[in-house]
C-alpha cells in the first residue's frame, strides 16, 4: 500500500476502503452483505501503529487512527503485514489493538482472493 504523501494525511488505501463503504451505503447495500479486508504493507505499514509507537517514531500522533476505528466500526477487518512490520523494525506489540497482524500480506491476498474476494488496489 502507498504511504500518504504528507505525514499529516491518512494512507490512501484506507481512504479508498472508506470510500467503498460509503458508496455501498449510498447504493443501499446492506452492511451484512459487505465483507471488506484492508491490508497495510510496504510504505503504509506504520499506519498500523498505535499512537504511542507512532509518536515515538514520527513525533506526532497517528493520523490514521480515527479512520481505522471507523472502518472497524463499519465491519472492515484492518490488517498489517507481519513481514513488513519486521522489515521496518516494528514490534507486533506496537500495533494498535484494532489492527490484526497477518503473517504476510501475500498470504492474506491469496487466501481472500481464492475465497472470492475482489482485489481493489490503490
What feature does the model see in each segment?
Residues 1-6, 47-53:
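Acidic/histidine-rich, surface-exposed loop or edge segments in extracytoplasmic proteins
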Residues 10, 49-51, 91:
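Short, solvent-exposed loop/turn and secondary-structure capping segments
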Residues 54-55, 59-122:
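A cross-taxonomic marker for long C-terminal extensions/tails that follow the last structured domain
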Residues 27-34, 69-75:
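Phosphate-binding glycine-rich loops and adjacent basic patches that engage nucleotide phosphates
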Residues 31-48:
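Acidic helix-start/capping segments at beta-turn-to-alpha-helix junctions
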Residues 1-2, 39-43, 82-84, 122:
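Active-site-proximal beta-strand/loop segments in catalytic clefts of secreted hydrolases
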Residues 1-33:
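N-terminal secretory signal peptides
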Residues 24-28, 47, 52, 78:
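Amphipathic alpha-helical interaction segments
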